[in-house]
């Protein structure tokens, strides 16, 4: 029997799919190379934006004519699970994020829907079927307690549940034994880790991970700026394994919009935090997220965001146009929605600005020697692709063949907004 998994959305979803793949493989299933050859199709869904839901619905609908057994899981299961079961009789089961480890229990018998905020079986992540062995993602928690007004995650993934630290450390050890050199710790707001445990916090966990032999780089995504303390940053800066790249979701550069979003910080506080990170971590790169067109965003609000983006000089910015999510506070502000064409124009303007900023920042890398972790080889061009400690993508040539998981010194000879180019130094 063969299975195939479609995954939509964030890195946490990709990690969940690897966990489910591991469960299926350990029970005798074989992963199919394509959906046509499969007997079971698992669709891991995302509800952060409407577009992600529409893509998943399109996939579910298209599978009807193939006659496959279908299981739908992920965030969309929590908010549209009943609708999916009623609209699509070919769907065998719907599993919310807390129930994904129960995949084997729902493959036969009556159609089932398992949703709700239950205790997550984190132990199942230890048997994840990872696509990459050298760079792995490890889930340290589920859920969120912050309730930003635009965000559906607390409603789909529930409240914060911290994973047992010894379970996390053991998974990291197993990954290292299997070839991992880079570990990325995953959580909705990773610095909330440990709030439901005794004697643990996020930085304590990172400090323990750093003691494991073979861990060369540690990354994490993402901390909430409101809860990221200077003492945390100082402790992290003292760990040589922690990569000098910090992703801090800003969401808006206007204080009034931040207040309406329930982000719990001001632009001044955010700028102070970034300044402290830049002082504490040599050659650090900073990334962020922005939402454009939040309900009630005026031209003045937008211009404040534009100016703040200019001021902060982020290395990379992931932007999205606001998408109303059912059940969230912001979605009830229909009378103040920003017209789609206005939001798109603002998005384009910010993107053009950030392209210039990123291009300017990346020019500083030209002529430098960077330690690059190899991710893959481009079979078409014969070039290799990897990442610097600051998470810059590097495309380079090498006289000798190099493999994923190797660290190579690369001389950078060209830089664009999103990619560096170079040659291996050896």
From Swiss-Prot:
Q: What class of enzyme is it?
A: transferase
Where in the cell is the protein located? Cytoplasm
Q: Where is the TRAM domain?
A: 363-426
Q: Give me the gene this protein comes from.
A: miaB
Q: Which residues form the Radical SAM core domain?
A: 130-360
What protein am I looking at? tRNA-2-methylthio-N(6)-dimethylallyladenosine synthase
Question: Which superkingdom heads the taxonomic lineage of this protein's source?
Answer: Bacteria
What InterPro entries does the annotation carry?
Elp3/MiaA/NifB-like_rSAM, Methylthiotransferase, Methylthiotransferase_CS, Methylthiotransferase_N, Methylthiotransferase_N_sf, MiaB_methiolase, rSAM, rSAM_horseshoe
Which cofactors are reported in the record for this sequence? Answer: [4Fe-4S] cluster
Residues the record lists as binding [4Fe-4S] cluster 2: 144, 148, 151
- Protein's UniProt keywords contain Nucleus: no
């Amino acid at each position: 029997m063969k299975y195939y998994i479609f995954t939509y959305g964030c890195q946490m979803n990709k990690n969940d799919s690897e966990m489910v793949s591991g469960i299926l493989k350990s029970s005798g299933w074989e992963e199919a190379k394509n959906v046509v050859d499969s007997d079971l199709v698992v669709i891991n869904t995302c509800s952060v934006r409407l577009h992600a839901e529409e893509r998943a619905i399109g996939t579910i609908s298209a599978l009807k004519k193939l006659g496959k057994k279908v299981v739908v899981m992920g965030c969309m299961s929590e908010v549209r699970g009943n609708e999916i079961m009623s609209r699509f009789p070919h769907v065998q089961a719907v599993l919310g994020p807390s129930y994904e480890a129960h995949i084997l229990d729902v493959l036969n018998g009556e159609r089932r829907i398992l949703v709700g905020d239950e205790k997550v079986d984190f132990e199942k992540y230890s048997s994840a079927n990872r696509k990459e062995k050298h760079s792995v993602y490890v889930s340290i928690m589920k859920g969120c307690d912050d309730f930003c007004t635009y965000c559906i995650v607390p409603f789909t993934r529930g409240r914060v549940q911290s994973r047992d630290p010894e379970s996390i450390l053991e998974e990291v050890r197993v990954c290292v034994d299997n070839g991992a050199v880079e570990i990325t710790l995953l959580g909705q707001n990773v610095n909330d880790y440990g709030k439901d445990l005794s004697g643990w916090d996020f930085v304590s966990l990172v400090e323990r991970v750093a003691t494991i032999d073979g861990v060369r780089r540690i990354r994490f995504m993402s901390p909430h700026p409101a809860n990221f303390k200077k003492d945390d940053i100082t402790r992290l800066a003292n760990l040589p394994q922690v990569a000098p790249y910090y992703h801090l979701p800003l969401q808006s550069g206007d204080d009034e919009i931040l207040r309406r979003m329930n982000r719990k910080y001001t632009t001044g506080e955010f700028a102070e935090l970034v300044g402290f990170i830049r002082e504490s971590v040599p050659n650090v790169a900073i990334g962020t997220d922005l939402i454009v067109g939040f309900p009630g965003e005026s031209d003045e609000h937008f211009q404040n965001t534009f100016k703040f983006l200019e001021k902060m000089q982020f290395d990379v910015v992931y932007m999205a146009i606001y998408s109303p999510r059912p059940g969230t506070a912001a979605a009830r502000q229909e009378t103040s929605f920003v017209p789609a064409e206005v939001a798109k124009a603002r998005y384009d303007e910010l993107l053009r600005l950030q392209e210039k900023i990123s291009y300017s920042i990346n020019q500083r890398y030209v002529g430098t020697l960077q330690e690059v972790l190899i991710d893959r080889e481009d079979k078409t061009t014969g070039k290799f692709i990897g990442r610097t400690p600051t998470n810059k993508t590097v495309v380079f040539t090498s006289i000798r063949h190099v493999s994923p998981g190797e660290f190579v010194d690369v001389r950078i000879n060209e830089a664009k907004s999103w990619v560096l180019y170079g040659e291996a130094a050896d």
